[in-house]
Regions:
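C-terminal accessory region of radical SAM enzymes
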Residues: 161, 165-175, 194-215, 219-222, ...
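The −1 position to Zn-ligating cysteines in a subset of zinc-ribbon hairpins
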Residues: 38, 42, 223, 287
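Short, acidic, Ser/Thr-enriched surface-loop or helix-capping motifs
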Residues: 233-234
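Conserved AdoMet/S-adenosylmethionine-binding subsite of the radical SAM
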Residues: 90-215, 226
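Secreted/processed peptides and extracellular or luminal domains of membrane proteins
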Residues: 45, 49-52, 230, 248-249, ...
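Conserved alpha-helical substructure of the radical SAM core
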Residues: 2-131, 142, 150, 154, ...
Length: 296
C-alpha cells in the first residue's frame, strides 16, 4: 500500500528516542492560510524586511475554496496567519465567520497586537475566533520597543487587557495567549499580563529555516513533524515547505480553483521531501539543512 492510500483525515506522530515516528495522513491536521503577508512592524528578530515576494491579500474565492476543502475533509484547525500581521486584512472577521459557518472547529490567529482596537477586538469576539496569540518580545518597555519597532509597549499591553475585558463581558470562549522571547527576567507588567491571559509562554529563538544564520546548528537532528501535520498556503496560493519559509524558497505546489490541498499534500514533491526527512537526508533540502527547529 502506498503512503497516500487508505489514510484517516488526521495526522499523528510520536517521538521515539528523539526520532519522529509518523503515521501519515491523507489530509493535514492543521492548515495555515496566510490571508495577507503585509506587516506594520519592522521587528529586529524577523526577516520580513528581507522578503522579496510581493505583498498580497488573498483573494476571497481562493480563501473559500481552501476552507470548503478543509470542511469536506473534517480538518478541525485552521490558522489565519503566517508571515504578516493578519489584522491588516480588513476582511479577517468576515473570513472567520465564513470558516465557522462551514464547521471549522478551531480558528487561530497570531498577531502583534498593535491593531487590536476596541472595534477590532469586538469584531473578532463576535465573529467566533477561537484563539489569538499575541507575540510580545521583550519583558521591559525598553527591550520591547528596541525589538518590535515601531510598536509601543504600553499600547500593546492596553490592547491585550481590553481584549480580555471584551471577551469576558461577551461570555466568549476565545483563548487569549501571549508568546514572548526575552533575554530578561519577567517584569511586574509581564507578571500582570500572565495573570489575566489564558496562557503565557517564553519561546526559543530560531533562525527562520536557516535564512538568517550562516553557522550550521549542532546536535542531533530530528525529522520535522510539520511535514506530516501542517500545510502552509501563502497569500498568492503557493504552498510553502513550512511556516518558516517566509520567502517561498521551496514551493511544493500552488492551490488554484482546479487544484486542491490534497493534490499537493499527497503529491510528488511533498512525498520526496518527507522521504528525505525519514532517511535523515535533510541536508539535501537547502531550507532544512541549517534550520534550527529540527534540533528543538
Amino acid at each position: 500500500m502506498s503512503m497516500i492510500q487508505d489514510f484517516s483525515s488526521r495526522a499523528a506522530c510520536r517521538v521515539v528516542g528523539g526520532v519522529y515516528d509518523f503515521a501519515a495522513s491523507g489530509f493535514p491536521a492543521v492548515v495555515r492560510i496566510e490571508t495577507t503577508n503585509a506587516c506594520n512592524a519592522r521587528c529586529t528578530i524577523c526577516p520580513h524586511q528581507s522578503m522579496t515576494r510581493p505583498v498580497v491579500t488573498m483573494d476571497e474565492g481562493l480563501f473559500r475554496w481552501l476552507v470548503d476543502e478543509c470542511a469536506a475533509w473534517e480538518c478541525r484547525e485552521i490558522h489565519l496567519h503566517n508571515f504578516g500581521e493578519p489584522l491588516l486584512d480588513r476582511r479577517l472577521e468576515d473570513r472567520i465567520r465564513y470558516a465557522k459557518a462551514q464547521g471549522i472547529a478551531k480558528l487561530k490567529v497570531f498577531s502583534n497586537g498593535s491593531l487590536l482596537t476596541e472595534e477590532r477586538a469586538r469584531g473578532l469576539v463576535e465573529a467566533g475566533l477561537d484563539e489569538i496569540k499575541i507575540s510580545f518580545d521583550g519583558a521591559s518597555r525598553e527591550e520591547f520597543e528596541a525589538i518590535r519597532r515601531p510598536l509601543k509597549f504600553d499600547r500593546i499591553v492596553e490592547n491585550i487587557a481590553r481584549l480580555v475585558e471584551i471577551r469576558n463581558a461577551a461570555g466568549s470562549k476565545l483563548s487569549v495567549l501571549v508568546a514572548c522571547c526575552s533575554t530578561s527576567d519577567k517584569t511586574a507588567t509581564m507578571r500582570e499580563l500572565e495573570r489575566i491571559v489564558d496562557g503565557f509562554s517564553f519561546g526559543r529563538v530560531h533562525n527562520w529555516g536557516g535564512g538568517e544564520f550562516a553557522e550550521r546548528p549542532r546536535g542531533v537532528r530530528k525529522s520535522c513533524s510539520r511535514l506530516w501535520r501542517t500545510f502552509t498556503v501563502l497569500s498568492d496560493g503557493r504552498v510553502a515547505l513550512c511556516c518558516l519559509d517566509y520567502d517561498a524558497r521551496h514551493v511544493l505546489g500552488r492551490i488554484a480553483l482546479d487544484t486542491t490541498i490534497r493534490d499537493v499534500w499527497t503529491g510528488e514533491e511533498y512525498t520526496r521531501v518527507r522521504s528525505l526527512h525519514r532517511e535523515a537526508r535533510q541536508d539535501e533540502i537547502p531550507l532544512c539543512s541549517r534550520c534550527t527547529k529540527s534540533f528543538f
